Each structure stands twice: as C-alpha cells, then as structure tokens.
Amino acid sequence: MGILVAILMAGWAGTQLVSFTPGPAQVTAAASSAPAAKIGTADLDALLAKIIVADQVDQSALDEIESQGKPVITAAAYYAAARFEHAHKRYDSALRYSRRALELAPKQAALHAWYAMLLVDSGQYPDAVAEAEQAAQIEPNSADVQRILGLAYYNAGRLPPAIEAWKHSLQLKSDAEVSRDLAKAEREASVEVNFTETENGRFTLRYEGGKPAQTLLRDDVFRTLDRQYDVLTHDLGSAPSGPVTVIIYSEQQFFDVTQAPSWVGALNDGKMRIPLGNVVSMTPQTEAVLRHELTHSFVHAIVPHCPLWLNEGLAQLEEPKSSLAFSQDVLQRLRSRQAPPLRELEKSFAGLNSDQAHLAYAQSLLAAEYLRSAYGMDGLRRMLMALATGMEPEDALRSVTGGGYDELDKSVSAFLSNRSL
C-alpha cells in the first residue's frame, strides 16, 4: 500500500531524501482491496451484472431496480456501483453512489463503514469520523468496523480513540496491518504527549512548545505554508478539503515515530512530518521541504493514485528545484540504458537502493520540467484532472501530449540533449 516519494535536497547521490509514504492516513489501497460487504440478502454479483454496461454504471438500470420498491436491495445496487467506480478510480461518483446507498439503508453498518473509508481517502476526516461512529453504534463488535473507526480517528488527529478502536479490532480479529498501524499510533502518542497544537484554518501544527524560539519558528512555518498554499491552489487548481496536519519533531523523535530509513529527511504519510533538529528559524532548505511536502498533500487531495514520478516531479518543481546540477549524469545513464523507463516509476520506490532512488527522483523532476516547458503548468494540471476522472496514467499523459510513455522518454532525452548543447 505504501509508496515512497523523495525530494533531492542538493546535487546528486549521497544527499538526504524527503519521503511520502501513505500509512494508515491514506486508505485508497485498503478501500480497493476490502472484500465486498453483505447488504441484507442482496446478491452483489448479480446486481453488478445488471448495472454495468460497457464498463460504465448504467443509471437507468439503477433507476429500474429502485422502482421495484425494495430499499435494501436498491442500496446494495448503489453500493456495488460505488465499489465499481472506486475500483476504476472515479472517486467522486463512488462517493455519490455511496451517499445514495446510505439514504436508502441507513441502518446498514457496512455502508457507513465503506463510506467512511471513502471520506478518509478524500481527506474529509470529520465526516469520516461521524460515519465510522455510526457504523460502530450499529455493529460495535465488528473487527472491520473498529479498524475503519481507528483510521478515521487517526486521520482526524484523535490518537487516543484511534488506539482504542484498533485495540478493540485486534481483540476481535488478528490483523497484521492493524497491528502495524496501532504500533505506529502508539509511538506517535508517546512522542507527542507534551506537544502543543495550534491551528490557523488551513493547517494544524503540532510541535514541542514552551520556548520563545519555538514560537518564532512556529510563526515562520505558518507563514511559509500559507504562502505556498496560495501558490499551489493557483498552480494545481484545487486544495485539500480540510486542514493539513504538520508535525515538527527533533531528529530523534522523527525516527522514533516513523522508523524511516536514515537517509529520509522528512515524511508525508497524510501528515507532514518534519524533523527540524536544532533549527530555530526558517532556512531556505526548510522552506523547500515544507513546500515540497505540502505539494504531496495537494496532489493526493486531487488524485490519490497519482503516478509516483508525476507526484515527485511536481513536488520538486514547487520547491522550486532545478535539475541542471545533475542533468548530465542522468543523460549519460539514459544513453547507456542504466535508467528505468518512466512507466516503471509509477509505483513505490521503497525497494530501491540510495543511488537508484536518487536517479528515479531525478528522472521524475526532469519529466516534470520537460512537461512544464512544453505544455506549461496548465498541461500538468490537466494531466492531474484527467487522472482524477479515472484515466490510466498513460491515457492521461496522451490526453495532454498526444503520446504515451515511449514518446515521453524520447522527449525527455531530447530535452536533456538540447540542454547540453
């Protein structure tokens, strides 16, 4: 379920990376892989066969089922439609069909739990908590419901009830993923027990307060984030639906909570986790990290399944960062076929060694730079919007450039070659 995105802090290999790794805070994969719940006596497979035509939900078929006056069966049909749309990355329609299912069968815990998962995935955390609590009231001893309740609480920044829900879930059913999420939440709660929390509408900032220098740094962090929030809203045409959580750690606290590799310099798992060590005032490097990590939060709000190279490329553009320092190294690797094609950089970089990771992130930045130079920020924005409709990455790329990955690889190489002349 995790993906790894990094920011090249300076130069080429041997530098520190900033990571983006969805944990319990982002449940797209969990929603996609969750087994279909039983809704009354409905046969979901049979309903799905009725409502899907040419790989699309047929609204007239749903209307026909609804006209038969059987609310629970109709709710099951809308639930089946929601799962189908979510599997095809059409998230807005998945939410819409889920809402209709709940209107028809409000006492079905499975429908509340499923809707809560979708709301977490779309960043609507307070609403997700409300739906998950409804599910838990109806079926308090369901391990799956308690798991989702924990996810909702965790994302809403409510660690104690999240821990309680996950413990309850594990008492009902052993689950390795829930155990992992619980352990992470307990580490986080232990480290942050004396943290101060401050909000400004757009951000919830948690930090170890109590010193004047930390208050000054807090104000600098808010100013930097607020400026970049406006920039990203303009550049990407959208913004997260709720406050973004930002947690400032010491170096040791950061690694205690995240258990990240030693080369990781910051992390976004739905919460921006920033280790500032002994920093007491804003530096250019810290500003770049904050801008980078906030970009990941914006991209995830638009399209949870963004190809990793695009996600990382955009984040580096927004720092802002240039590839000039290492473009010749990348060009040599491309010419000697020591660099992977971009189609192989859609998923997690977590299994790469440090040198491979730096190369992958450099390629991501170069691809984004080329697309911006050829199609403008509008082209990158249109690609995100195409992905948000459920398009596959290569189809979204074609919708902007007219070509697929093979053409993009060639164009990036030509872009680098022309730069070297």
Model-derived segments and their meaning:
Residues 77, 111, 145, 178-179:
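TPR alpha-solenoid repeat register
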